[in-house]
Curated annotation (Swiss-Prot):
Upregulating conditions: By heat shock, bile salts stress and other stress conditions.
UniProt entry tagged with the keyword Nucleotidyltransferase: no
Organism domain of life: Bacteria
Binding site for ATP 2: 608-615
Biological source species: Propionibacterium freudenreichii subsp. shermanii (strain ATCC 9614 / DSM 4902 / CIP 103027 / NCIMB 8099 / CIRM-BIA1)
Paired cysteines (S-S): none
Name of the protein: Chaperone protein ClpB
Subunit structure: Homohexamer. The oligomerization is ATP-dependent.
Region (Disordered): 515-534
């Protein structure tokens, strides 16, 4: 026979039979080899067909293996490639004849099985002994496949290539397996309009990842099922083509094209009854292409142009530009339908529509405030992703976290279990003692253990009852959802009596049970051990886990912290009350929602002499806002003095070295969008740097070298400068005169459009002698914290503190001389003493004035008491 007429599975079965004969050393491949090989293929339709006629496939396979073992065999290196026996050749010829009579274009494994039952051989005897006859097989085969015919090498047992390489979305909609689609009416209507055209009726959905392109197609499938579509689309099948399955396992050249051609022929022969959907449409360009073969897009073009294939595509803007637009012949066959990101209000509506599905899945209750919080917080805090996808993910993860907490033991039970374990171990240890004290202790332990076990049993019973109540609510919701799907099916089938029975009988009864169970849960919520409600707090915790922003910064506690901002930062930063107040006011305006949400949280320029706390305020601000001092991006602008170095901030342009690395500023903010950005010594930067910063200050965004938009809306931008510091140290000027002089210098150096975009220009005052006293205390506290790891404590006398403040005071250089003084006088002496062994761990150290009164002495005292 012509082996080209065998289906892929039949060809594989014959090849496996020959290989089996070679392995066993048989000179020829017999029908029993083929029978055994067909039963060894997991995807084969042979085993189900045998089952349909009442035979046991495993028993048939065992008999075939036993028959193969009885065949003549030879061993050694001289074993030749087995040939097909005469009986097997007759089986193949008989199968081909049967296929032709049945109108099949290819010979499947079912045809081979029927032929094995017909042609005289050991295989026929095995099948007959198991009650398998040709007539029974033919009847079962025809019943299973109906009017389907094998029209391609990929078809098997009447299974169409389309069913094999696609997912029927309309069937999934009938089965209630698709999530409800809320909104998107205009996009679905536009898709329906394009599909109703005579030619080029192929819409392509274009939009950012996560905006709901696939949901539009699922919405169309649901409308087709309900009949809520134009007449030209009523009763149509909407199938999603699975290109990955089509390419997977295509071993031979032309096999992929053969599979795709079979699918396309089926769609074409359906005469418009099938609408095809390809997600990630750009994958058809180049799919299956190899030397001398045609890719999928070129095979689709003729059908698309003639209107014989109604295809819906979905892809992102970038992929469309990169793949589809490069092929004008393919692009012109599609009509673009843009799918934009929904608003926060629309996202809340979408979440409300999905709530029931997620409640049933996680068996928890999701409050409306949680849905609103998910939409608002994801829009505000999660950048780089689109609504509604990111909001749905928030709700899903928050519900998942709560479900895990419900399934885990509550803290009270965990504590009691550990207590029972500890008392049990103590009981075993004390039981061996015979003295009266131990016996009294044992009695006390036994009493405590009995009480703990009794308490634990009560809590475990209560917890089990609460879990049962929660699970009951979830199960009721799942049953109601399944009944609604069943009612829809009966309505479509015209069985209105059954649909009415479900809608007006079974569902109301279940709803009543659900209300009772929910009411019981709500009554016990105040005293329950586990919560079953997803609230806005849970959503905020997930946002915190994703972005690193502390939860307390987004909920009620934020207002108290913001109102106390000056005092909290003042504990760390001495003096500069005006600077702290200016920064605090700007942050409060932003968090209260009064300032422009499309600009950075705050943008400040700190002016003043060195060592007065400009950088320290930036660190304190990062610690206050983000509970982490390291949440600060520090860039030394003296590194950006040359024109060519400016591009390092946003990344090298395409074609230049370092293009893939991104920019120092943009990458830092992209990875950590909630941070304080400190641009130190801003006056040293090249003027072109300020052109870049204009976009950040005005729009809160910046495009990097790779074309990605980086969001600066949640960044506090701080620039420091020493410009005009000579006037700050002039005692002959009043504060107003000093400010005017400094601002004159600043205006000469920076352009007006740059200065005009800043929230505040803050002038730092010189540190006073009194300020130095406080800084001494702060510096010594830091030293004490560093030494705490070695359990060493330092006690500095008042005289020594006063001397350090007096000697370290320098109005020109600020607080830095004091830091150096503490380093050279206290830390150096301490280090020498520790190395010499005169001061060791767990020891108290005293610091006092020396006898000459021109320095301090560091001495070890008694060990620190435990």
């Amino acid at each position: 026979m012509d082996t080209e007429k065998l289906t892929t599975m039949s060809r594989d079965a014959v090849t496996a039979a020959v290989r089996l004969a070679l392995t066993k050393g048989n000179p020829t491949a017999e029908p029993v080899h083929l029978l055994h090989a067909m039963l060894m293929v997991p995807e084969s339709s042979v085993a189900p067909l045998l089952k349909a006629v009442g035979a046991d496939a495993a028993r048939v396979d065992g008999a075939a293996s036993a028959a193969i073992d009885k065949l003549p065999s030879s061993s050694g290196s001289s074993v030749a490639q087995p040939q097909l026996s005469g009986a097997l050749a007759r089986v193949l010829a008989d199968a081909e004849t049967r296929a032709d009579k049945l109108g099949d274009q290819f010979v499947s494994t079912e045809h081979l099985l029927i032929a094995l039952a017909e042609v005289d051989s050991d295989a026929k005897n095995i099948l007959a002994s198991n009650g398998v006859t040709t007539a029974a097989l033919e009847k079962a085969f025809n019943d299973s496949r109906g009017d389907k015919r094998i029209t391609s090498a990929e078809s098997e047992g009447g299974e169409s290539a389309l069913d094999k390489y696609s997912i029927d979305l309309t069937q999934r909609a009938k089965d209630g397996k698709l999530d409800p689609v809320i909104g998107r009416d205009s996009e679905i209507r536009r898709v329906a309009q394009v599909l109703s055209r005579r030619t080029k009726n192929n819409p392509v959905l274009i939009g950012e990842a996560g905006v709901g392109k696939t949901a539009v197609v699922e919405g169309l499938a649901q409308r087709i099922v309900k009949g809520d579509v134009p007449d030209s689309l009523k009763g149509r099948r909407l199938v999603s083509l699975d290109l990955a399955s089509m390419v997977a396992g295509a071993k031979y050249r032309g096999e992929f094209e053969e599979r795709l051609k079979a699918v396309l022929n089926e769609i074409k022969s359906a005469e418009g009854q099938i609408i095809t959907f390809i997600d990630e449409l750009h994958t058809v360009v180049g799919a299956g292409a190899s030397e001398g073969s045609m890719d999928a897009s070129n095979m689709l073009k003729p059908l698309l142009a003639r209107g014989e294939l109604r295809l819906i595509g979905a892809t992102t803007l970038d992929e469309y530009r990169e793949h589809i637009e490069k092929d004008p012949a393919l692009e012109r066959r599609f009509q673009q339908v843009y799918v934009g990101e929904p608003s926060v209000e629309d996202t809340v509506a979408i979440l409300r529509g999905l709530r029931e599905r997620y409640e049933a899945h996680h068996k928890v209750r999701i409050t409306d405030s949680a849905l609103v919080a998910a939409a608002q917080l994801s829009h505000r805090y999660i950048t780089g992703r689109q609504l509604p996808d990111k909001a749905i993910d928030l709700v899903d993860e928050a519900a998942s976290r709560l479900r895990m907490e419900i399934d885990s033991s509550p803290e009270e039970i965990d504590t009691l279990r550990r207590q029972v374990d500890r008392l049990t171990m103590e009981q075993f240890a004390v039981e061996k003692e015979e003295d009266p004290g131990s016996k009294a202790r044992l009695a006390r332990i036994n009493s405590d253990l009995a009480d703990a076990k009794e308490q634990l049993r009560g809590l475990e019973a209560r917890w089990a009852a609460e879990k049962e109540g929660l699970n009951k609510v979830g199960e009721l919701k799942t049953r109601i959802d399944a009944l609604r799907t069943e009612a829809d099916k009966h309505t479509r089938d015209g069985d209105l009596a059954k649909a009415s029975e479900i809608l007006y009988g079974e569902i109301p009864e279940l709803n009543k049970q659900l209300d009772e169970a929910s009411a019981a849960e709500e009554d016990s919520q105040g005293k329950s051990m586990v919560s079953e409600e997803v609230t806005s707090d849970d959503i905020a915790e997930v946002v915190s886990a994703w972005t690193g922003v502390p939860v307390g910064k987004m909920l009620e506690g934020e207002s108290e912290k913001l109102l106390d901002m000056e005092n909290r930062i003042g504990k760390r930063l001495v003096g500069q009350q005006a600077a702290v107040k200016a920064v605090s006011d700007a942050v409060r305006r932003s968090r209260a929602g009064i300032s422009d949400p499309n600009r950075p949280t705050g943008s400040f320029m700190f002016l003043g002499p060195t060592g007065v706390g400009k950088t320290e305020l930036a660190k304190a601000l990062a610690d206050f806002l983000f509970d982490d001092e390291t949440a600060m991006v520090r860039i030394d602008m003296s590194e950006y003095m040359e024109k060519h170095s400016v591009s390092r901030l946003v990344g090298a342009p395409p074609g230049y070295v370092g293009y893939e690395e991104g920019g120092q500023l943009t990458e830092a903010v992209r990875r950590r969008p909630y941070s304080v950005v400190l641009l130190d010594e801003i006056e040293k930067a090249h003027p072109d740097v300020f052109n870049i910063l204009l976009q950040v200050l005005d729009d809160g965004r910046l495009t990097d070298g790779q074309g990605r938009t980086v969001d600066f809306r949640n960044v506090i931008l701080i620039m420091t400068s020493n410009l005009g510091s000579q006037f700050m140290a002039d005692p002959s000027m009043s504060p107003e005169e000093r400010r005017n002089q400094v601002m004159a210098v600043v205006k000469d150096h920076f352009r007006p459009e740059f200065l005009n975009r800043l929230d505040e220009i803050v002038l730092f005052d010189e540190l006073s002698r009194e300020d130095l006293d406080k800084i001494v205390d702060i510096s010594l506290d830091k030293l004490n914290r560093r030494l705490a790891e070695r359990r060493i404590s330092i006690d500095v006398s008042a005289a020594a503190r006063e001397w350090l403040a007096r000697t370290g005071y320098d109005p020109v250089y600020g607080a830095r001389p004091l830091r150096r003084l503490i380093q050279t006088t206290v830390e150096d002496q301490l280090a020498r003493a520790m190395l010499a062994g005169t001061i060791s761990d767990d020891q108290k150290v005293s610091v006092d004035m020396n006898q000459a009164g021109d320095g301090v002495d560091v001495k070890g005292e008694a060990p620190v008491s435990a």
